[in-house]
A protein has these predicted regions:
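Generic structural signal for hydrophobic core residues of well-folded globular domains
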Residues: 12, 39-42, 77, 81-86
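Conserved short "hinge" loops at termini or chain/domain junctions
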Residues: 1-68, 135-156
Length: 156
């Protein structure tokens, strides 16, 4: 995991997290993993192993790219989902504004949405080419991609 449960303390107080999850650490881990998967769905053209690592592999692969803004986005998303579950002494509107700033949508573009649309280009590695496929995926994920049909000769 890119974000540990103890790192959510920058977004929510520990006693608030314990009140929401009823002292169940599995609930916090579940929300963090869901937030990471949510971010991965936006960042499909980048090398997700370099950004997030792989905790399902043996041995575990650590992320090679360190980006604090990506970590902050995951923390905001996980915190927002925790607060939506139950919000003891937490202003939900403040978390909604943070969520819109970090994620966004078509009407209110946020950081992740702008990366997906190509408006922001972070200094992250693109997904490597898969040698088992005929197409070069690393070239298609670049900012500019073009192709054409084969030239054909017409005879009458």
């Amino acid at each position: 995991m890119l974000v540990l449960p103890s790192e959510l303390n920058t977004e929510l107080y520990p006693e608030v997290i314990e009140a929401i999850t009823r002292s169940n650490p599995d609930e916090t881990i579940s929300q963090i993993k869901a937030a990471e998967d949510f971010c991965k769905s936006y960042l499909f053209k980048y090398d997700l192993i370099a950004l997030f690592g792989n905790d399902k592999a043996d041995p575990v692969v650590s992320p090679t790219v360190k980006d604090e803004n990506l970590k902050k986005t995951i923390k905001v998303i996980a915190s927002y989902w925790l607060v939506r579950k139950a919000s003891p002494n937490v202003n939900l509107d403040l978390f909604r504004e943070d969520f819109e700033l970090m994620v966004g949508n078509k009407e209110i573009p946020g950081w992740l949405y702008d990366i997906k649309e190509g408006n922001i280009s972070p200094d992250w590695p693109y997904k490597p080419d898969n040698p088992d496929t005929p197409e070069d995926e690393s070239a298609t994920n670049d900012g500019v991609h073009w192709s054409s049909n084969q030239k054909r000769t017409q005879r009458f």
